[in-house]
């Protein structure tokens, strides 16, 4: 799944907050829930407009970014 098909950033949707495409669910909410100890299945129950494929693809993409040899680019992007 292409990242652009996974995440939408649109100023007309939640003021440009990155959301799961086709939803109004902020991407950050998945990480917030997991950090709070909520399981992926519970998150999906709370946000039925997010598909399991979307959530897993996002987590896999984040993992690849954080374990990539190009992590310096990530550091620069969030600086």
Where are these regions (language model features)?
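N-terminal first-folded block
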Residues: 1-25
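Short, surface-exposed, charge-dense and proline/glycine-enriched linear segments
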Residues: 17-19, 25-27, 71-79
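Amphipathic, hydrophobic secondary-structure cores in small proteins
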Residues: 18-20, 25-61
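C-terminal structural segments of small proteins and small subunits
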Residues: 50-78
């Amino acid at each position: 799944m292409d990242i652009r098909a996974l995440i939408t950033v649109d100023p007309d949707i939640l003021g440009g907050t990155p959301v799961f495409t086709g939803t109004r669910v902020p991407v950050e909410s998945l990480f917030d829930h997991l950090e709070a100890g909520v399981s992926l299945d519970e998150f999906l129950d709370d946000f039925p407009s997010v598909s399991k494929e979307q959530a897993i693809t996002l987590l896999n993409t984040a993992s690849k970014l954080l374990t990539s040899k190009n992590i310096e680019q990530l550091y620069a992007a969030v600086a």
